[in-house]
């Protein structure tokens, strides 16, 4: 019981935001939000906001939206993360934001899954479960590493953005291309705490056999400490 309010936004563009330098690029095709009217008035007086809805972003330039992230964009290709689209159901409850049925599109790469962020106003805690049918790292990163799986380890790079937060999640990749090396059925757990990012064990199918990779990435300001162990078993490469 009670009164509810439905808010809808259509075909809106973000061009400038406080504390973000320069012009922005974000095109919001649709945003729908439903909340209890009394709760909405209470949130205007400082009470936690509660409600649910759906959004559809058709074009977002993450580089322009994250100018203070500290990410070295030189490690990425010229067009990587320049145009990202996303749709999702969402729910806000107090200090927690939940995204379900999340669908992401980054050029030729698609992803789907769920994301939950707790403690939005203080020290955020992230939980995610994402599935990527096919991923070619050369579409995103300049791969200058010498080892066959060094490109795979670079999947840890986005976690640098939240390295000082609490993060737990699972990334599954159906087919992964990295510097000419192909893997399938990749499962990558990730945990971050206090500037330390652990991905272990990363597992996948590799030319008839299996591969296991364990990585630990330490972030201290501008300094990175990257450690890894790679193990390959029962692979068949044919004639060399």
Regions found by a protein language model. Name each.
Residues 178:
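Active-site-adjacent "gating/activation" loops or surface patches in catalytic cores
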Residues 1-37, 41, 45-96, 101-110, ...:
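Small-residue helix/turn framework positions
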Residues 181-182:
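Low-complexity, polar/charged sequence tracts that form flexible coils or short amphipathic helices
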Residues 150-158:
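Long, charged amphipathic helices and adjacent flexible linkers at domain junctions
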